[in-house]
Structures are given as structure tokens and as C-alpha cells.
Amino acid sequence: MSAAAPFAQFAYLRSPDQSASQPVLHPVAIVGAGPVGLSLAIDLAQRGLKPVLLDDSDRIGDGSRAICFAKRTLEIFDRLGVAKPMLEKGVSWQVGKVFQAGECLYQFDLLPEPGHKMPAFINLQQFHVEKFLIDRAQALGIDLRWKNRVVAVDNNRDGARLSIETPDGRYELEADHVVACDGARSPMRTMLDLSFAGEIFDDQFLIADVRMQAAFPVERWFWFDPPFHSGQSCLLHKQPDDIWRIDLQLSPDADAEHERQPAVVRPRIERMLGHADFELEWVSIYRFQCRRLQTFRHGSVIFAGDAAHQVSPFGARGANSGVQDADNLGWKLALVMSGASPDLLLTSYDSERSEAADENILNSTRATDFIAPRSAMERVFRNAALALARTQPFARRFVNSGRLSLPTPYTGSVLSTPDVDSWSAG
């Protein structure tokens, strides 16, 4: 495995704000230039606003991280003007197979009917997604400030003042609204003394991205108790450029630093692939986390993406839900900033995306309990469901290798009204 290198790097440029005698006021400041922050910035720019986008780094990292982007997210990317290159680069798929030991129990098709504009899912490394979004943001003239690290925030209902550290020193800016899209470890969350409520699971998983020529079909394959990884689970996905994502369950007491060493990872992959030639591209270890902030709006600061909520990777609900946060928030911020709607509209972001987060956490928790049973009774239920699924289609709905990401209907939203037979406007 070669040394990590940035996928892309960007120049730090001094902002005129840094020479101003007083903090400059911006309508919206977005903290974090990942998929969520970039999506929101593009959305706002397309609506005529001029957000400032701050990121403490100056590069896109090499790790693929999120890879699975759902139909709804692709529809959002299409509206933002970035779907075309993503579809061209990504690997489209809609069929999955579930195995136990060496036997295929069943397969499923996520988009059996024809005529859809977007595929059910594409697999595309997060660094490609970010690069396409950055290209679009630059084309729109968005004020994207690299190496601008927020180190303090003075937050109230009327706006916020951010203190920002740069290679040229510290400066301040003000914003009517600040959106924290700064990831799972969110410094913004820490600065506001906010914490997650939820659960961190004991089981660990190894992610390995390997480069190889393989004849596997472009499908999602999930194994329970495979012969090459006895008593655990495994996931296989194809990515662009002959890269394959492999997730391997590890024991709760596994030494993460030891397990990520190439000398330890390679034998595990070899047991799975046999004598196939492959190169390790990227390795990481993670634990399932299903947690969120109690509320996503705090004064003038609004949280989105992993800064607001975390779920396990199985089901592809992390990055997808974050982009959908941005989609929900963008038009509401635009209406409020234009004066066309009262500030109260922003409370619906909190209620609607809290509903989505709760649904994602519920599904992720259920998937985790099925994949890694924590009690003898859970294991008995899982094994019974797997045994029945071989021959009984009704039992397959109980098999949970990660319920895949779906849009949230917002049935409980304050913006939803009952259907009526007649409508006064025609």
C-alpha cells in the first residue's frame, strides 16, 4: 500500500475580509467543504445567494470513504448540475445478493421497472464526488476559502461571529446564518458544547479498497458466516477504476492499529479472493455509531450531515442523508434570506431532518443487531431468518444486511397538510 497522497490540492488565497477594518457580514457561512457543505453552497448560489464556504484543509484526501450514492441523491446532484460526470464515472448497480456460508440465499432488484432517469445506486469514491462538486462551485464563482479554520464562534439568534485561523493569521467574519457541515468530529459542535445522544457499538469493521481485475458482476454481495471469514460477515462492492470495496467484520476486542497493517490485511483478503492478484489502495477500521444531536438548530448555527447525525455505513445512509439535509435546507434559507418567508420556516428543517435521522438510526441499529447479534436470542432469530430465506420469500424481509437508503416522506412535517378531494386553487 503506497503512502497516502491528496487526490487534489487547492491554493490558499487571502480574502479581502482579512484586510477589512471590521468583520464583514455574509448572508450564509458554511463550515466544511465536503459533499454536504459543497452541495448546500451550490444550491444557495443557484438561488442567487452568495455563501462563503470555509474549510480547514486545502485538499481532497485519498481515502474513498463514502462510495454508494442513491437515486434520490443523484436526482439532487442533477439539479445542482453535477450528476452527468458522476454517472459517467460511477458504477451503476441495482442487484444485490445475500449469501450464507458459501450459498446464495436470494437476490433482489432495487429498480425492477424500466424508464427511470437515474439508476438505483452508483458506486463512486467520495474524492471524485467532492472534485465534481468543487468544479461546479468554482464555475459558479462561490467564495471557497481553503485553509480557513474556524476556531471560535459567538452565536445568537440574530447572527454569529466566527473567528478564523489562516496561514496569514486570524480574522473574523459575521453571518446571518452559519451551517456546520464539518463532519463527524465537528469542531463547531465542540465549540458550542453540544454532544450526541445514541449508541456506539462494540463490533469493529475493516474497510479495504483493493485494485484488481475481477470477473465478479456489478452487484452488492453480502455474506453471513462466509467460509473465508468464519463466524463474521463480509460485503463486496465494485468501484470505478478496477477498485473493489471489501468490508470485513472484526471482533470487538481486535486491536485496530494492528488490524490495519498491510501484513495483517493481505492474508484476510487472500483467503477471500484466493490467488487473485490485487493491490491494497486504502484501509480503515470503524465502529458502528448511531447517534445524533437532539436538535439541529442552535441560535444562528444549523448542523447538517455527519455533524448532526451519524449512522453505520451498511445501508448507505450517511452521505446520502447529508446531501438530503442540504437539499432540504437550501430552499428554506433562500426564502428566509429574501424575506419571502419568516424565520420560522427554518424550524421545519429541524423537524423534518430529525425525522429522517431517526429513521436512518432505527434502520442502522436494526441492521447492526442483525449483522452482529449481541445476545443469544438475537442470534437465534437471525439464524432462523437466514434458514427460512433459502426457500421462503416472505422470510427475506427479515434478513437485514443493511436496509438501503430511501427518501423520507416527512409524514409528520408541519409543512404537510391533509389531502382533500377538492382544492380551491383548482
Task: Map each language-model feature to its residues.
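Helical substrate-recognition/capping region of FAD-dependent monooxygenase/halogenase enzymes
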Residues: 1-31, 42, 46-47, 100-103, ...
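Core beta-strand elements of the Rossmann-like FAD/NAD(P) dinucleotide-binding domain
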Residues: 24-26, 168-177
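Conserved mid-domain beta->alpha element of the FAD-binding
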Residues: 33-42, 46-48, 133, 180, ...
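Glycine-rich FAD pyrophosphate-binding loop
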Residues: 45-65
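Active-site-adjacent segment of FAD-dependent monooxygenases/related oxidoreductases
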Residues: 62-140
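Conserved FAD-binding catalytic core of PHBH/FMO-like flavoproteins
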Residues: 135, 142, 177, 181-290
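A conserved short coil-to-beta-strand element within the FAD-binding core of flavoproteins
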Residues: 146-161, 284
